[in-house]
Amino acid sequence: MESSLYKKTSGKARRALRVRKALKGCSLKPRLSVVKTNKHVYVQLIDDVEGKTLAFISTLAKVAKTSGLTRKNQDNAKALGIKIAELGKGLQVDRVVFDRGAHKYHGVVAMVADGAREGGLQF
C-alpha cells in the first residue's frame, strides 16, 4: 500500500519531467525556471547545454530583501520576473524558454512570467 505522501511527491516529479522533457535551453535561449515553496519563490536562467545557471533571484536574495520582496505573493512574483529580465538583459539574453515545473500556469507562476515579459524577455 502506497502512502499518500509518496503518491503526491512522485506525481509532482512526474509532472515536472513531463514538462522538462520538451524544453531545452541554450546560452542564446536559456530556460527560465520557476520553483515555488510554501514561503518563497526561486527564479533562474539555466543553460542546459553547459549545465550552468546564468542568473538567479529569489525572495531570499539580498537584492530582493533590500527591495522588500521577502514574501511569496503575486506582487512580489511579478517584481522578481522584472528583476530576472534585467539580469538577463545584462547577459544579452532577450529570448527564453519558460519552465513552470510541476506547477500550474496561474497565480505566482503566471505573475513571474508576466513580469519577465514586462521586463523585456520574449518567450
From Swiss-Prot:
GO terms for cellular component: cytosolic large ribosomal subunit. One of its GO terms (molecular function) is structural constituent of ribosome. The keyword 4Fe-4S does not apply. The keyword Ribonucleoprotein applies. One of its GO terms (biological process) is translation. Keywords: Ribonucleoprotein, Ribosomal protein, RNA-binding, rRNA-binding. Part of the 50S ribosomal subunit; part of the 5S rRNA/L5/L18/L25 subcomplex. Contacts the 5S and 23S rRNAs. Belongs to the universal ribosomal protein uL18 family. This is one of the proteins that bind and probably mediate the attachment of the 5S RNA into the large ribosomal subunit, where it forms part of the central protuberance. This is Large ribosomal subunit protein uL18.
